[in-house]
């Protein structure tokens, strides 16, 4: 089975499968692996035995958390699939896998259409400009409606779908698809052995008109993409299948439209045509623009690397997983050049040398060792010590840093403490390993209580991390109540705040004087929450002490001024100062910088910010009033109401602090008939009465 890596990159596809929870993403991946001959037994998510869900908890919860990269072959082409999680708490995983993909298959639930989470993942894919094809899954489900789903792609995603298949029958009678490119029907008769064989037949008479109508739309769209085709089409000539496919491919690769296919992965119908579409329409590594980066240490000097083995080696580490036998596995996407296993490379992001141990192409949880890694492919590497996600590996003689990925700050925190002394040490190791794998998982020591506090993107995110500590690292820990990650900021600009740090106790003293202006930082580039500008002239503060003032200010920001929450969105400008030949030191200026910031911030109308969540509740109409009333009582702001397949959808912005335990309340108010999803939206100022409570609680008054 172990076929070698293909050298012809035209025949390689690096794709992801993205979807809402339960739209059937993992099942779809499983079927792909089955038909491409990698898997000998079809795994069902229902039995908890699917190949890509390889962590215990994923099997238990039936959701995919870590994206395993899987390689398979189809008709002489190689497909590298990265399974992405659809649950919002794992957005960092999704973003990270999108970064290294060339194309994606968006799986939608044929009954629900575009759901909130699929919308979010879609927006993330837009950010990285990933070409996509859409697969409308679960066509065998009660209430499945292909045309409704296509409409939601237009309405909710604002995207342009291009229908290239129509379903034959629906729900229990779903038996196949009409291929609008080849103008024939493919049907899976009866319970054929796992749907491997399908028959190509004529289009059923009752669907002929509909097929003709959609075929015309398809031809018009394709013809408009190319002058030569347009002339041919307007002249009444037939376009050949190859011409149509080339036209669709061109539009898809340019992300101008998204071909839509349909099927039922669970019932094994429509999977092979989807694989054909992946090869026909999604880009190969050669169709994608050259990857851009910069010279290490000089962000303004841009360089690019073409996806060719003749270029110097460069690769991006996009995932780290702990493997039971090999220890740390680093997944990398090679963008240029090639390299042997055992070779030495440089981690340009950190400026450290690394040696590549063994190289593998992964198949979910089985490994296929390879000797060399070449451009355009995805590998797992053993033996990298200092490399974390988002780092660039490259040729020591020709260094490049591929853009780094920026990760969101955690919105929820819990205190965690080991149950016994022996757990104490293990907890440290466990937290460190998990933080390496997941940059949105943050850890800090609470100075006042001495507790370890972990932060993440949501309750589920932290639940799963604590669960992994128990299973993988055998750490028993007590977890406190979730705490909201508040922030502090200032509202007005305060100029020329002066602070002098003086200490004279015999021997050399300490002396530093700084004058700063502190102001709110608005719309910073790349989401930065702090900026430092130096405007000192004439050496009144020596050059070597300026970074110390900056460091001192950043230190003070960690601990806030109102209630001990970190200060954000602040710009500090150092205007002037004074120093003493003997008594000045880096330490003295650090203290001065820190105290000056505190003094300025207190005068700058400080306020507390809280995370607001975008909440979407789907409820039967009878409970609409209760749901809205409840959201209002939680300080929620209702933003929109709409109807979706017979139910009502309420969209609101609600402070995270008011959303704890919402699951239970919503169930009891609606007899379990409503469900909701929430994602972090933004930080906003807290009302005065709430602010008083937070400060009182923090200062213990």
From Swiss-Prot:
It comes from the Bacteria. GO terms for molecular function: GTP binding; GTPase activity; translation elongation factor activity. Keywords: Cytoplasm, Elongation factor, GTP-binding, Nucleotide-binding, Protein biosynthesis. Disulfide bonds: none annotated. GO terms for cellular component: cytoplasm. It is found in: Cytoplasm. PANTHER family: RIBOSOME-RELEASING FACTOR 2, MITOCHONDRIAL, TRANSLATION ELONGATION FACTOR G-RELATED. Belongs to the TRAFAC class translation factor GTPase superfamily. Classic translation factor GTPase family. EF-G/EF-2 subfamily. This is Elongation factor G. It comes from Mycobacteroides abscessus (strain ATCC 19977 / DSM 44196 / CCUG 20993 / CIP 104536 / JCM 13569 / NCTC 13031 / TMC 1543 / L948) (Mycobacterium abscessus).
């Amino acid at each position: 089975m172990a076929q070698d890596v293909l050298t012809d990159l035209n025949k390689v596809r690096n794709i992801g499968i993205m979807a809402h929870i339960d739209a059937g993403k993992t099942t779809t991946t499983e079927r792909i692996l089955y038909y491409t001959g990698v898997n000998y037994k079809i795994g069902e998510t229902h039995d908890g035995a699917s190949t890509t869900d390889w962590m215990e908890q994923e099997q238990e919860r039936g959701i995919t958390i870590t994206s395993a990269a899987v390689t398979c072959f189809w008709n002489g082409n190689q497909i590298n699939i990265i399974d992405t999680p659809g649950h919002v708490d794992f957005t960092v995983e999704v973003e990270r896998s999108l970064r290294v993909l060339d194309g994606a298959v968006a799986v939608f639930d044929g009954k629900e259409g575009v759901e909130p989470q699929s919308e979010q993942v879609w927006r993330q894919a837009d950010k990285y400009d990933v070409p996509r094809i859409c697969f409308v899954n679960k066509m065998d489900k009660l209430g499945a409606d292909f045309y409704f789903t296509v409409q939601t792609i237009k309405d909710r995603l604002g995207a342009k779908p291009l229908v290239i298949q129509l379903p034959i029958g629906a729900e229990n009678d779903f038996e196949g698809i009409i291929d609008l490119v080849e103008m024939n029907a493919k049907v899976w008769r009866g319970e054929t052995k796992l749907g491997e064989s399908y028959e190509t037949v004529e289009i059923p008479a009752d669907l002929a008109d509909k097929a003709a109508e959609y075929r015309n739309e398809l031809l018009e769209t394709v013809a408009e993409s190319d002058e030569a085709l347009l002339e041919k089409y307007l002249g009444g000539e037939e376009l050949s299948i190859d011409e149509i496919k080339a036209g669709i491919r061109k539009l898809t690769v340019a992300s101008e439209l998204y071909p839509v296919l349909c099927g039922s992965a669970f019932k094994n119908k429509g999977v092979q045509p989807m694989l054909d579409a992946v090869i026909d329409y999604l880009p190969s590594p050669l169709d994608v623009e050259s990857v851009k980066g910069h010279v290490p240490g000089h962000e303004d000097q841009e360089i690019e690397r073409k996806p060719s083995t003749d270029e110097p080696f460069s690769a991006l580490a996009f995932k780290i997983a702990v493997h039971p036998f090999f220890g740390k596995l680093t997944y990398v996407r090679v963008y240029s050049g090639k390299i042997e296993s055992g070779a030495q490379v440089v981690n340009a992001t950190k400026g450290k040398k690394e040696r590549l141990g063994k190289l593998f192409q992964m198949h979910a949880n089985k490994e296929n060792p390879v000797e060399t890694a070449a451009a355009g492919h995805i590998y797992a590497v053993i033996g990298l010590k200092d490399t974390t996600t988002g780092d660039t590996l490259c040729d020591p003689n020709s260094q490049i840093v591929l853009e780094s990925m920026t990760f969101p700050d955690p919105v929820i925190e819990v205190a965690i403490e080991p149950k016994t002394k022996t757990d104490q040490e293990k907890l440290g190791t466990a937290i460190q390993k998990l933080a390496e794998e997941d940059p949105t998982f943050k850890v800090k020591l609470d100075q006042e209580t001495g507790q370890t506090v972990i932060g993440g993107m949501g309750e589920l995110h932290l639940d799963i991390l604590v669960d992994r500590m128990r299973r993988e690292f055998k750490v028993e820990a007590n977890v406190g109540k979730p705490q909201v990650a508040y922030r502090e900021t200032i509202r007005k600009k305060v100029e020329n705040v002066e602070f002098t740090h003086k200490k004279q106790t015999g021997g050399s003293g300490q002396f530093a004087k700084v004058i700063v202006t502190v102001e709110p930082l608005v719309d910073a580039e790349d989401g930065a929450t702090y900026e430092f500008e130096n405007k000192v002239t004439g050496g009144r503060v020596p050059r070597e002490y300026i970074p110390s003032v900056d460091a001192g200010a950043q230190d003070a920001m960690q601990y806030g001024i109102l209630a001990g929450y970190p200060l954000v969105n602040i710009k500090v400008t150092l205007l002037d100062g004074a120093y003493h030949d003997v008594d000045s030191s880096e330490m003295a200026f650090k203290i001065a910088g820190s105290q000056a910031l505190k003094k300025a911030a207190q005068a700058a109308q400080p306020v507390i910010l809280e995370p607001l969540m975008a909440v979407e509740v789907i409820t039967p109409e009878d409970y609409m009033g209760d749901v809205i009333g409840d959201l209002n009582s939680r300080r929620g702001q209702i933003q929109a109401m709409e109807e979706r397949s017979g139910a009502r959808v309420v969209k609101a912005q609600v402070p995270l602090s008011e959303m704890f335990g919402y699951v239970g309340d919503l169930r009891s108010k609606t007899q379990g008939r409503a469900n909701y999803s929430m994602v972090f939206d933004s930080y906003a100022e807290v009302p005065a009465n709430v602010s008083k409570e937070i400060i009182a609680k923090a200062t213990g008054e």
